[in-house]
From Swiss-Prot:
Taxonomic source organism: Picea sitchensis
Function (record text): Catalyzes the formation of S-adenosylmethionine from methionine and ATP. The reaction comprises two steps that are both catalyzed by the same enzyme: formation of S-adenosylmethionine (AdoMet) and triphosphate, and subsequent hydrolysis of the triphosphate.
Family: Belongs to the AdoMet synthase family.
PANTHER family: S-ADENOSYLMETHIONINE SYNTHETASE
Magnesium in keyword set: yes
Species lineage: Eukaryota, Viridiplantae, Streptophyta, Embryophyta, Tracheophyta
EC number of the protein: 2.5.1.6
This protein's name: S-adenosylmethionine synthase 2
Binding-site residues, L-methionine: 56, 99, 246, 277
Length: 393
């Protein structure tokens, strides 16, 4: 039977781009806790010994940006120059302005509009995807790459592998077969892990520890065989990492944040954006739509696209593709989605409770993926029971 290879990657919370995503979302969380109507577009960049937060924020919240930056860096493990950044001594630059009044009047009419009248914060198109190949209804390549990254962080923080440092990347290649449009994973072809480490550890110990403490607990044995290839720190040395090794910027890991290269992506990043930004809220609602279709058994794979114009509440278009796996025609799946999901930004915000801060809610999304997570704060992962007039007729 014909098979093909597909690959997804992930990066750890200590990767400089992901550090920036987490700082931007930590700022968003802080704003929403005090003022759920905060308008936030917070970017972060970092390089050796420096973190800068900048963007447009309109909020009644009293925010200590420097404290948020240092706390986030510290929690990730950036506690000395040796590991790539010193949370307590790095330079923190802040350049935050108010949201443009032109955008404000178009989007929410200075709070005079009812939720269903709130316009999209910008134009754009977003995609949601779901597949029946894992219990999370996510692609297995993405799930495994992401879980390997999370496990790396876990064994670093709990002391199992004390030689680990915060920065790291993972990548998984899987051999699939196409079963009438559905994706069926056959085996793991290649596992790649590149992790930052201290000076003391040997490459042999790195490889042994990664196999025992990271790969073994994460990748089900049934997918591994004698032909599976392992590339464990293939460059041979990764001591310098974090912002010391590479500059970081919010919004540069959008495929890791979503579906690992499966489905499609409209190009908009998530982190640091409040729910009036449809880059985020639109992508969340179409994930819920796609997931609900697959969970209901109406398709084995599903892609949903939505598009918006700035200041306009109603979406311009909604599109569905079941890749030929639908138990009913795509046209009917589309009708069903339109009947069951309200794509107006103000209504997405209410239905997914996106103004609620607290519990590090959005900061949690900023590492290890926004989708396929088992966490009540990820409201868009809730499968919605579908009402269908046609079925009752």
């Amino acid at each position: 039977m014909e098979t093909f290879l597909f690959t997804s990657e992930s990066v750890n919370e200590g990767h400089p781009d992901k550090l920036c995503d987490q700082i931007s979302d930590a700022v968003l969380d802080a704003c929403l806790i005090q003022d759920p109507d905060s308008k936030v577009a917070c970017e972060t960049c970092t390089k050796t010994n420096m973190v800068m937060v900048f963007g447009e924020i309109t909020t009644k919240a009293d925010i200590d940006y420097e404290q948020i930056v240092r706390k986030t860096c510290r929690e990730i493990g950036f506690i000395s120059d040796d590991v790539g950044l010193d949370a307590d001594h790095c330079k923190v630059l802040v350049n935050i302005e108010q949201q443009s009044p032109d955008i404000a009047q178009g989007v929410h009419g200075h709070f005079t509009k009812r939720p269903e009248e709130i316009g999209a914060g910008d134009q754009g198109h977003m995609f949601g995807y779901a597949t029946d190949e894992t219990p999370e209804l996510m692609p297995l390549t993405h799930v495994l790459a992401t879980k390997l990254g999370a496990k790396l962080t876990e064994v670093r923080k709990n002391g199992t592998c004390p030689w680990l440092r915060p920065d790291g990347k993972t990548q998984v290649t899987i051999e699939y077969r196409n079963e009438g449009g559905a994706m069926v994973p056959e085996r793991v072809h290649t596992v790649l892990i590149s992790t930052q480490h201290d000076e003391t550890v040997t490459n042999d110990q790195i490889a042994a520890d990664l196999k025992e403490h990271v790969i073994k607990p994460v990748i089900p044995e049934k997918y591994l065989d004698e032909n599976t290839i392992f590339h464990l720190n293939p460059s041979g040395r990764f001591v310098i990492g974090g912002p010391h090794g590479d500059a970081g910027l919010t919004g540069r890991k959008i495929i890791i944040d979503t579906y690992g290269g499966w489905g499609a992506h409209g190009g908009g990043a998530f982190s640091g954006k409040d729910p009036t930004k449809v880059d985020r809220s639109g992508a969340y609602i179409v994930r819920q739509a796609a997931k609900s279709i697959v969970a209901a058994g109406l398709a084995r794979r599903c892609l949903v696209q939505v598009s918006y114009a700035i200041g306009v509440p109603e979406p311009l278009s909604v599109f569905v593709d079941s890749y030929g796996t639908g138990s009913i025609p795509d046209k009917e799946i589309l009708e069903l989605i339109k009947e069951n999901f309200d794509f107006r930004p103000g209504m997405i915000t209410i239905n997914l409770d996106l103004k609620r801060g607290g519990n590090g809610r959005f900061q949690k999304t900023a590492a290890y993926g926004h989708f396929g997570r088992d966490d009540p704060d990820f409201t868009w992962e809730t499968v919605k029971p579908l009402k269908w007039d046609k079925a009752q007729a």
